[in-house]
């Protein structure tokens, strides 16, 4: 925030502004930034290609969306592994630590070959629905990204205007002019220029009076918005330009000191940034990998991600090659940019995000009567974690709601909730609020395969003293069968989760599992298929347990995930086999014993559950492809000791940000 304030007030002295208008404009921009501090994420992994069953080691960089400093306030970051059908394979929750947001995702055994996506976000980022943070990884082969072919539709602000706004980059200056063949442009217009909501110019413009912006006066790099405003500060025309990304970069050097090789064949490698300012430090992640190809144009990196991908509405993950040629000009002409809502902000329409910043984990719910579903006021709710020795108690409010805040425990922690009336009676119904995670509904970045296997037999490291080089060993075994379509009903289902699917996903409850099914939504504990709208109102899907239908108000939390063998979802014409009751869709649950009885469920005032706790970082195991993985390095320079054999056929990749928000990206072969 300090850097943002400095840049904004510095702009006041670099532009010719009307004092009153300028002060109002700046106050509105600052108010919007304070009301809604936006964030961006970037995922750095230990590789780009994997095999089924391997572990993806990762670090998430969480930065302020405006100045790219790591001063964002969210405490948690969520990372999802999405399969080629956009379904969540794994989801982890990372907590802020001294190393940043560091964690891992284990790829399930048996997943199909394909391009998968790592999707990262905070709860605060969910306030923006058209800006996704995606990173492609390839399982079962190598691939590269292709530039997305955007349509010819342009920003809706430009579509109804006959005024031509021209922006020309001429060496070290930007020339801005307006033209309207059908009008003399006698109206009063102003030009407003900003980069990620930081105002860089505001002043009058007219036909025949061009605006010249010098390189030195533009303090930011990335996507620039040039807005033509009328006398009411309403945007008439907007044009986007990708300019001066070097202003956001902090170049670093990696030097291999071969002359200082130690007796154990370790060679120093010095990483430093000569352009660091006073007090500025680096916060980077690093990996050393086997360099089997030098073609990196089909990969994305932190520079293109923060400066381009996350600043364009509905923009997919783009390869770095897009920013190295004139392709970005055409792409921006077909995109819109409303992330920072500047067209509204300059008119005084400042808004706060509907979803608050997540600063602590919360367990909440409602207590109501068994008959009539009336709220129980001043009810007593106990929260117990037997394996952590934790106990807390609270009371319900007038609406019967309760909340436990600051529940920070690792993943897999088990909890027990029980509720009573003020008089200590247990004849109540306890409803638990479940965490909702948005499904990814956007398009998939285009790509192409470059090879079919990620096994690198030629990447064997030098054998240590006394080591033995073994011949290739093949291991054969019978794959266990997990049939998810073992009967006539299941074979006609539109979507099924078998036992292996349930085990690999690790869902904590049935609602979390069902949220992964396309067109299935969960609202207030009820499941709806395709919206569930009928003539007589909104109706949930029918629930069948071991082939027997239960009442609409049946609580699926009564079924423990350890008892579930299969879940089948019927949402199309397949519901006909269930009769009229299946008109709004059917969710069929098959238990392992096959004799589930509603009478055997736990008490209505008690719930045992497991939340999505934070992940505990684990140590890295080096492998032939990535022998070195350092997710968190902080300082002004770094000295690494690496084996001498890394000097050939290995490259080092360093990415991160500085304390001043400058972006670091370096790729180079060691020893060169």
Language-model segment annotations:
Residues 444-500, 596-600:
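Short, acidic, small-residue-rich periplasmic hinge/interaction motif at the N-terminus
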Residues 526-571, 593, 597-602, 654:
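Periplasmic plug
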Residues 489-515, 529-532, 548-550, 593:
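Short, polar/charged loop or turn motifs at beta-strand boundaries
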Residues 125-152, 156-162, 238-243, 277-354, ...:
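Acidic glycine/proline-rich low-complexity segments
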Residues 92-96, 204-205, 390-399, 627-635:
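Short, acidic Ser/Thr/Gly-rich low-complexity loop/linker segments typical of extracellular
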Residues 39-67, 144-149, 169-179, 226-227, ...:
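Beta-strand-rich structural segments
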Residues 513-514, 566-568, 587-589:
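Non-catalytic regulatory/gating segments with a bias toward low-complexity or hydrophobic composition
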Residues 78-89, 192-200, 288-293, 379-393, ...:
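Short amphipathic beta-strand segments in non-cytosolic proteins
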């Amino acid at each position: 925030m300090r850097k943002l304030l400095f840049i904004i007030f510095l702009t006041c002295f670099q532009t010719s502004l009307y004092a009153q208008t300028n002060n109002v404009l700046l106050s509105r921009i600052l108010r919007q930034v304070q009301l809604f501090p936006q964030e961006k994420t970037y995922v750095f992994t230990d590789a780009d290609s994997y095999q089924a069953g391997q572990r993806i080691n990762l670090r998430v960089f969480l930065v302020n969306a405006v100045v790219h400093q790591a001063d964002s306030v969210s405490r948690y970051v969520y990372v999802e592994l999405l399969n080629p059908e956009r379904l969540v394979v794994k989801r982890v929750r990372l907590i802020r630590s001294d190393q940043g947001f560091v964690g891992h995702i284990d790829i399930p055994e048996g997943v199909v070959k394909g391009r998968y996506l790592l999707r990262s976000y905070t709860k605060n980022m969910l306030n923006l629905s058209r800006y996704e943070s995606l990173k492609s990884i390839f399982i079962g082969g190598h691939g590269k990204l292709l530039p997305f072919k955007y349509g010819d539709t342009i920003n809706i602000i430009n579509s109804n205007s006959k005024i031509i706004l021209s922006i020309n980059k001429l060496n070290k200056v930007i020339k801005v002019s307006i033209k309207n063949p059908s009008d003399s442009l006698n109206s009063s217009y102003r030009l407003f220029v900003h980069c990620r909501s930081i105002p860089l110019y505001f002043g009058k413009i007219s036909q025949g009076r061009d605006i010249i912006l010098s390189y030195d006066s533009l303090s930011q790099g990335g996507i620039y918005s040039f807005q033509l405003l009328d006398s009411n500060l309403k945007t008439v025309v907007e044009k986007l330009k990708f300019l001066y990304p070097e202003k956001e970069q902090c170049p670093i050097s990696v030097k291999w000191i071969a002359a200082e090789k130690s007796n154990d064949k370790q060679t120093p490698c010095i990483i430093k940034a000569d352009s660091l300012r006073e007090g500025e430090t680096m916060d980077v992640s690093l990996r050393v990998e086997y360099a089997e190809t030098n073609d990196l144009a089909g990969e994305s990196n932190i520079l293109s991600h923060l400066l381009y991908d996350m600043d364009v509405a509905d923009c997919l993950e783009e390869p770095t090659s897009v920013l190295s040629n004139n392709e970005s000009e055409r792409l921006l002409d077909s995109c819109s940019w409303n992330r920072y809502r500047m067209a509204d902000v300059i008119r005084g329409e400042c808004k706060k995000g509907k979803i608050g910043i997540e600063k602590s984990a919360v367990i909440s719910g409602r207590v109501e009567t068994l008959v009539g579903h009336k709220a129980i006021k001043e009810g007593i709710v106990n929260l117990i974690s037997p394996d952590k020795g934790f106990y807390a108690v609270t009371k319900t409010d007038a609406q019967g709601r309760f909340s436990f805040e600051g529940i920070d425990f690792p993943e897999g922690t088990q909890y027990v909730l029980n509720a009573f009336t003020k008089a200590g009676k247990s004849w109540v119904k306890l409803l638990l609020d479940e965490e909702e995670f948005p499904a990814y509904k956007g398009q998939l970045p285009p790509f192409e395969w470059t090879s079919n296997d990620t096994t690198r037999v030629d990447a064997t490291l030098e054998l240590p003293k006394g080591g033995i080089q073994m011949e290739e060993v093949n291991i054969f075994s019978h794959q266990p069968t997990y049939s998810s379509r073992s009967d006539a009903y299941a074979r006609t289902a539109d979507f099924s989760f078998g036992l292996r699917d349930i085990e690999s996903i690790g869902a904590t409850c049935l609602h979390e599992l069902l949220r992964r099914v396309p067109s299935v939504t969960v609202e207030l504990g009820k499941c709806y298929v395709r919206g569930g709208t009928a003539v007589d109102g909104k109706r949930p899907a029918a629930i069948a347990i071991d082939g027997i239908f239960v009442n609409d108000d049946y609580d699926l939390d009564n079924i423990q995930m350890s008892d579930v063998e299969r879940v089948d979802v019927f949402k199309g014409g397949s519901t006909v086999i269930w009769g009229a009751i299946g008109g709004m869709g059917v969710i069929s649950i098959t238990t392992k014993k096959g004799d589930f009885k509603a009478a055997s469920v736990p008490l209505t005032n008690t719930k045992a559950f497991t939340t999505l706790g934070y992940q505990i970082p684990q140590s890295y195991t080096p492998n032939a492809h990535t022998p070195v993985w350092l997710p968190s390095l902080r300082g002004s320079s770094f000295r690494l000791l690496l084996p001498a054999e890394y000097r050939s056929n290995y490259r080092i990749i360093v990415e991160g940000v500085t304390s001043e928000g400058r972006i670091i990206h370096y790729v180079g072969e060691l020893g060169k």
